[in-house]
Amino acid sequence: MARVSGVDIPREKRVEVALTYVFGIGRTLSQKTLAETGVNPNTRVRDLSEEELVRIREYVDNNFKTEGDLRREVQADIRRKVEIGCYQGLRHRRGLPVHGQRTSTNARTRKGPRRAIAGKKKPGKK
């Protein structure tokens, strides 16, 4: 199994798609990597030579932040915003959407499941 930045990339997929399994590499960076290293994007990972894999691995490691480093950087950015008390930090702290989305309706993913306030009313005696 081919490894790039500590991630096993799937052997059956095209290289262009397989590289996107690495956190921090999307479609565009994948295409850029393959263009710079001179690898055909339509090649399957299983058909890559060892030399091509080494070129891809070195290019990714030298030019992009991926996996653990990138995750740590994102967490540090969020932590910094929370500490300085800016608006985005407050939204993170409260568990609400950060980028200006509406919250009157929707935003269920960020807010979590609904919590009933009083529960169902029982039918009263008449």
From Swiss-Prot:
Family matches, as InterPro entries: Rbsml_uS13_C, Ribosomal_uS13, Ribosomal_uS13-like_H2TH, Ribosomal_uS13_bac-type, Ribosomal_uS13_CS
Superkingdom of the source species: Bacteria
GO BP terms in the entry: translation
GO terms, molecular function: rRNA binding; structural constituent of ribosome; tRNA binding
Location of the region described as Disordered in the Swiss-Prot/TrEMBL record: 94-126
Compositional bias per record (Basic residues), positions renumbered to this chain: 108-126
UniProtKB keywords: Ribonucleoprotein, Ribosomal protein, RNA-binding, rRNA-binding, tRNA-binding
Any one Pfam family match given in the protein's UniProt record, by short name: Ribosomal_S13
A single Gene Ontology CC term: small ribosomal subunit
Entry function: Located at the top of the head of the 30S subunit, it contacts several helices of the 16S rRNA. In the 70S ribosome it contacts the 23S rRNA (bridge B1a) and protein L5 of the 50S subunit (bridge B1b), connecting the 2 subunits; these bridges are implicated in subunit movement. Contacts the tRNAs in the A and P-sites.
Oligomeric and partner information: Part of the 30S ribosomal subunit. Forms a loose heterodimer with protein S19. Forms two bridges to the 50S subunit in the 70S ribosome.
Protein family per UniProt: Belongs to the universal ribosomal protein uS13 family.
Protein known as: Small ribosomal subunit protein uS13
Originating species: Streptomyces avermitilis (strain ATCC 31267 / DSM 46492 / JCM 5070 / NBRC 14893 / NCIMB 12804 / NRRL 8165 / MA-4680)
Organism ancestry: Bacteria, Bacillati, Actinomycetota, Actinomycetes, Kitasatosporales
